[in-house]
């Protein structure tokens, strides 16, 4: 792989995530109307601009259910449903309407599973929609039962109403059923409060009493109601050290294994007795491994009169994963640090992600 910088990167596998475009040559030749995004325009019955000509599948353009904006959806599930709708409409005369698709997908990446549904933060930014997001790290089932696997969930939602916009999940086990739950709530115009009410089948080998989806809802509710004020990794990374006080509330043993540069370690259990060590004229950023203890520290500080406090969303786990250096090893053994490429890309937008 040859970069613009002139450097060459040896690789055994290259993944091209470049997207696709609808093949509409036949539709154009037939004089059918195309939409703003280049797909075949269809109405709610999936009928094109020409009477009695219908279109389904990857090439059609249809308003997104959440925004009403033109949308292209390249997924097999909606295409099959569209085929059934068109069959009914051709036989019975446009009696069935298509509701649109929010875009729910899943993929296997070696041992991991990645899944997405609805509108991610990047898309919301592109469309100028205000939103809030949260990141939670959970286990696929009860931690005391063997073989629980890590799972990370990010959701986006309306910061006022709590309406759920989208979700992304990365993990190893149980990702599929969680993304399906998020998709169902989004499709029915649900909110983060609905995530808190979802009733899942529970037994230790399959889930936790507080399921990862419910936990994501609880954290989002804390944000909306003001129980916590999150800071996101991009924000925290770009704040100059002299303007922030980094408070690591993990145990000393955890702290000894590494922390954020310049962080001060005050374990959560000692925090109430060491409040005098904290500044009140500087923003304090609390953090722990995944977010829970950082949240508890935030609550303790605000209840003791500290009004300049924010908690790192997703904790140190999220920050480290997002800011990890990109080291490329060449065939001659030289190592190249390509981290600035990551930073440049990440800083193109200033809104929290």
Give each language-model segment a name.
Residues 173-191:
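A short, polar/charged loop-to-alpha-helix boundary motif
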Residues 2, 7-88, 185:
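FAD-site-proximal beta/loop scaffold in flavoenzymes
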Residues 88, 92, 184, 299-303:
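Short, well-ordered alpha-helices that flank and scaffold nucleotide-derived cofactor binding pockets
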Residues 155, 182-183, 236, 284:
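Generic hydrophobic alpha-helical segments
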């Amino acid at each position: 792989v040859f970069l613009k910088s002139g450097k060459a990167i040896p690789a055994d596998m290259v993944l091209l995530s470049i997207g696709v475009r609808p093949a509409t040559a036949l539709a154009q030749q037939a004089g059918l109307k195309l939409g703003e995004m280049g797909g075949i325009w269809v109405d709610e019955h999936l009928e094109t601009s020409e009477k009695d000509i219908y279109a389904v599948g990857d090439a059609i353009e249809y308003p997104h259910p959440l925004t009403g904006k033109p949308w292209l959806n390249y997924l097999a599930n909606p295409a099959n449903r569209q085929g059934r709708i068109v069959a009914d409409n051709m036989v019975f005369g446009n009696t069935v309407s298509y509701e649109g698709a929010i875009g729910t997908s899943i993929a296997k990446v070696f041992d991991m599973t990645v899944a997405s549904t609805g509108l991610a933060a990047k898309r919301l930014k592109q469309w100028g929609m205000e939103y809030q997001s949260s990141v939670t790290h959970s286990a696929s089932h009860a931690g005391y039962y063997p073989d629980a696997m890590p799972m990370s969930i990010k959701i986006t939602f309306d910061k006022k109403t709590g309406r759920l916009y989208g979700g992304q999940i990365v993990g190893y086990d149980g990702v599929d059923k969680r993304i399906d739950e998020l998709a169902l709530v989004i499709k029915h115009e649900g909110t983060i409060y609905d995530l808190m009410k979802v009733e899942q089948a529970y037994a230790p080998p399959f889930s936790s009493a507080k399921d990862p989806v419910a936990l994501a809802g609880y954290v989002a509710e804390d944000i909306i109601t003001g129980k916590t004020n999150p800071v996101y990794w991009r924000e925290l990374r770009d704040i100059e050290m002299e303007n922030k006080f980094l408070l690591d509330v993990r145990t000393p043993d955890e702290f000894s294994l590494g922390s954020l540069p310049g962080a001060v370690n005050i374990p959560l259990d000692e925090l109430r007795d060491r409040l005098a060590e904290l500044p009140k004229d500087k923003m304090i950023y609390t953090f722990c491994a995944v977010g829970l203890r950082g949240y508890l520290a935030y609550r303790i500080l605000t209840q003791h009169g500290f009004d300049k406090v924010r908690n790192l969303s997703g904790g140190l786990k999220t920050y480290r994963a997002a800011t990890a250096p990109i080291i490329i090893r060449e065939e001659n053994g030289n190592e190249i640090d390509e981290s600035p490429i990551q930073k440049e890309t990440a800083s193109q937008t200033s809104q929290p992600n």
